[in-house]
UniProtKB/Swiss-Prot annotation:
GO cellular component, one term: cytosol
Protein name, UniProt field: UPF0250 protein Swoo_3713
Cysteines joined through disulfide linkages: none
Family under the similarity heading: Belongs to the UPF0250 family.
Length: 88
């Protein structure tokens, strides 16, 4: 796991925003939702934005997380998606 202080800074459960930045792809949002569904099943409608040159997409999704471990494992799994450059 990651060495974070989420448990010291946040009260769980809480709504947590993830921003996933990756190569421009029509399927990036679907792949992000699929990963989130494995951890926290639910109905998600992520917002998407294309960079000014069309090179990258950013997907923002809010997830109700239950623990520090859930926040961290989502960071790890979202970063493992093919084409993802950053998870914020």
């Amino acid at each position: 796991m990651l060495d974070t202080k989420f448990d010291e800074l946040m009260e769980f459960p809480c709504s947590f925003p993830y921003k996933v930045v990756g190569d421009a792809s029509e399927t990036l949002a679907d792949r992000v939702v699929a990963v989130v569904q494995k951890h926290v099943p639910g109905d998600y409608v992520p917002s998407s934005k294309v960079s000014s040159k069309g090179t990258y997409n950013s997907i923002t999704i809010r997830v109700t997380v239950q623990s520090k471990e859930q926040v961290e494992s989502l960071y790890i799994d979202l970063a493992a998606i093919e084409g993802v450059k950053r998870v914020l």
